Regions:
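Intrinsically disordered, low-complexity terminal regions
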Residues: 1-73, 78-79, 83, 128-130, ...
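Surface-facing alpha-helical segments and adjacent helix-coil boundary elements at the starts of domains
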Residues: 48-49, 65-104, 109-115, 119
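Fold-core signature of tandem repeat domains
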Residues: 91, 95, 103, 110, ...
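Leucine-rich repeat
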Residues: 96, 115, 135-139, 179
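Short glycine/serine- and acidic-residue-enriched loop/turn motifs that recur at repeat junctions
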Residues: 100, 119, 137-138, 164, ...
Length: 254
């Protein structure tokens, strides 16, 4: 396994567009070539080595045999692991917006929290966040009909609003609370929320949402039977009937 370590040389007041931080882009390059990759600091193009210290193993490897370790504050670094299909990206701290955008495989691990649009339109792979995540986790970007189509996202903390909006497949698990309207326009994905949320599944046509904490259910959902899940009772609802939806919503019985 080749390990590449990347550390910020200073703090950043503006965001950095760094979609080059991915095993596909770095695995076959020398450390000097990695440092010469282009990133954007605000509206100015820079070299990766102008902003970050790049260290690690020199020998090239396949993307699947590459680990990229990001150490320090990456909360203003956007598009980490964008489009990756193999290998591992490990963020030892916080990650900026659009982390894991369009992932096709591999593992993105974040020991801190992630900003908005985590796992946007991801296809395959796995994202694990030890902290919290922002809005639009696993969602589709403006104008897109489908968000997440496959893969897994696991968040140990809480998530923001519009969790899994427009998702067409895959699964999202949030152990804490979620913001308003999780699973809005869900078209086939699976969402689990371990805490509370508000108005899940608006305009859902397909898929499943489970809420273990408290929530308010839209009146356009039809109450069905009470089911047992892992020894606990959940009220089952079907909808969203406004969209002739066939989705399933399970809410824990208090």
């Amino acid at each position: 396994m080749r390990t590449i370590s990347i550390k910020p040389l200073r703090g950043f007041e503006v965001s950095i567009e760094a979609e080059v931080i991915s095993p596909e882009r770095m695995a076959a390059l020398s450390l000097d070539q990695i440092g010469a990759l282009a990133v954007w600091l605000g509206n100015r193009q820079s070299l990766l080595s102008d902003l970050f210290l790049v260290e690690g193993d020199e020998a090239p490897a396949s993307p699947a045999e590459t680990l990229i370790r990001l150490e320090g504050d990456f909360s203003r670094v956007k598009r980490i692991a964008e489009g990756m299909s193999a290998g591992t990206v490990e963020v030892l701290g916080d990650a900026g917006m659009h982390a894991g955008n369009g992932m096709k495989g591999g593992l993105l691990s974040i020991t801190g929290s992630a900003d908005d649009w985590l796992g946007r339109e991801m296809r395959e792979g796995k994202i694990v966040v030890a902290g919290d995540a922002g809005n639009y986790v696993g969602a589709g970007y403006r104008g897109e009909k489908c968000g997440m189509r496959g893969g897994e996202i696991e968040i140990s903390g809480s998530a923001g609003a519009y969790l899994g909006e427009h998702m067409c497949g895959g699964s999202i698990r949030v152990n804490g609370d979620a913001g308003d309207f999780p699973g809005a326009a869900n078209q086939g994905g699976t969402i689990y929320i371990g805490g509370s949320t508000y108005l899940p599944g608006a305009e859902m046509t397909k898929g499943a949402i489970t809420v273990k904490g408290g929530t308010r259910v839209l009146p356009s959902y039809q109450k069905a039977e009470v089911v047992q899940v892992e020894g606990r009772e959940f009220q089952k609802y079907l909808g969203d009937l406004v969209e002739n939806g066939k989705g399933e919503l399970l809410v824990a019985v208090s």
